[in-house]
């Protein structure tokens, strides 16, 4: 029996992710980069679907495997998980195809187990309604099994958010996110790019969250000339909303403290270039107008290279990349920046559907994260000039990492006030969980709780 190449690719990705504890998004990007033969959407659906529902699928399989899931060899278990996911969640795949293709995979990658896999999957199909039910007494245990999340994290989330919000968050984590792109409005209008993409067969819709984001369906966007020309970038609506919120248009110097992989850096740089271009078009002089500059800090060299590559593709010459630890102060930048973005490392609890491995993490050291976040914000605040702004953002719904950080910072910094706060979350407005707060450094105030004084 010939093996379906898409399912083979999905199997190999799942095996590598499980064995080596890799991030699914990175492994899939590596696997699917530039290969036109593969059905990328189908592979992503199976890989993400299996990872998102792993505990639930294993709970089902335990009903049909006498020795239990935990004693089943990994190769067989991954094939069974793929089969159950296709049968239970993928209406486009007939049950017989899910079984037959799983058997074909077993003959190649789990030799001698094809009969066992065939029997388990057929037995599941015969008993699908009863087997799919989660029959446990505790509410938290139910959430952990049905939405495939370690019980310890479920307990943490319920303590943070309450039961109903935790349930909504975990349900949201099982939904597919729309593919969105940020238009490089320094080069082309949103309408202009939408027209070009529609002419190539793509379906485009305007984002409700950002006026320079399009929701796109219809094919391999990164292989279009428009992508290669730097007319757009793949970026979530929520991430672009942070750059919109920061609003770097009029800034002369912006410092992005945790810049890699560079999406928000580039989004701000595009804002600045577009504003500069508009200013030049209104100026009668022949001399060009400076667009301002972004200093992008990143602690790791290989991730700094990602920012530089993004800048080159988009044609952005107003970004300077520095390999630097954001918790350490750069003396020559103190008091120089119009805008500082502190998009800090966080628990990622707001983006579980994009990083489903978060649900299975052994533990979260929230105290350590909070200390890092405080240190980055503290260091970043020193770069802000009087009258300048400091934007703090995360992709988590944990109040300790969000409002808690801001409250702590403001209690020690009378020279800053909170101008604006935005919360995105599945249980408030249906988006992934992001937090943003814009702080302004007020002229005539001094730090360390000294109150308002003349300077």
Where are these regions (language model features)?
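S-adenosylmethionine
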Residues: 1-455
């Amino acid at each position: 029996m010939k093996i379906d190449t898409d399912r083979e690719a999905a199997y190999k990705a799942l095996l590598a992710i499980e064995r080596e504890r890799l991030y699914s998004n990175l492994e899939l990007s590596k696997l699917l980069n530039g290969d036109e033969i593969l059905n990328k959407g189908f592979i992503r659906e199976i890989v993400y679907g299996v990872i998102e529902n792993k505990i639930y699928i294993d709970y089902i399989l335990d009903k049909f495997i006498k020795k239990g899931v935990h004693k089943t060899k990994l190769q067989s278990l991954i094939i069974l998980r793929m089969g159950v996911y296709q049968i239970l969640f993928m209406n486009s795949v007939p049950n017989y195809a899910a079984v037959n293709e799983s058997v074909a995979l077993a003959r190649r990658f789990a030799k001698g187990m094809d009969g066992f896999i065939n029997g388990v999957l057929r037995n599941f199909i015969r008993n699908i309604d009863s087997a799919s039910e989660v029959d446990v007494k505790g509410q938290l245990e139910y959430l952990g099994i049905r939405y495939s999340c370690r019980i310890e994290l479920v307990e943490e989330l319920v303590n943070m958010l309450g039961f109903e919000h935790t349930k909504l968050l975990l349900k949201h984590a099982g939904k597919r996110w729309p593919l969105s792109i940020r238009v490089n409005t320094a080069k082309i209008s949103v309408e202009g790019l939408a027209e070009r993409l529609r002419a190539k067969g793509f379906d485009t819709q305007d984002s409700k969250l950002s006026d320079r984001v399009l929701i796109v369906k219809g094919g391999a966007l990164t292989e279009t000339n428009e992508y290669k020309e730097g007319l757009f970038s793949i970026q979530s609506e929520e991430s672009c909303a942070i750059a919109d919120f920061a609003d770097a248009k009029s800034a002369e110097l912006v410092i992005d403290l945790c810049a890699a992989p560079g999406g928000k850096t580039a989004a701000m740089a595009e804002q600045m270039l577009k504003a500069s271009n508009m200013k030049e078009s209104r100026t009668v002089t022949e001399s060009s107008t400076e667009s301002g500059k972004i200093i992008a800090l990143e602690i790791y060299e290989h991730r700094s290279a990602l920012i530089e590559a993004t800048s080159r593709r988009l044609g952005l010459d107003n970004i300077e990349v520095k390999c630097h630890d954001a918790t350490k102060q750069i003396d020559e930048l103190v008091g120089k920046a119009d805008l500082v973005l502190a998009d800090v490392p966080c628990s990622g609890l707001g983006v579980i559907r994009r990083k489903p491995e978060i649900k299975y993490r052994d533990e979260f050291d929230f105290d350590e994260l909070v200390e890092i976040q405080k240190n980055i914000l503290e260091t970043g605040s020193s770069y802000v000039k009087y009258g300048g702004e400091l934007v703090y953002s995360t992709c988590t719904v944990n109040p300790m990492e969000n409002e808690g950080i801001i409250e702590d910072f403001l209690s020690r910094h009378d020279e800053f006030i909170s101008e604006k706060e935005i919360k995105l979350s599945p249980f408030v407005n249906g988006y992934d969980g992001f937090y943003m707060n814009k702080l302004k450094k007020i002229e005539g105030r001094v730090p360390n709780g000294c109150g308002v004084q003349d300077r």
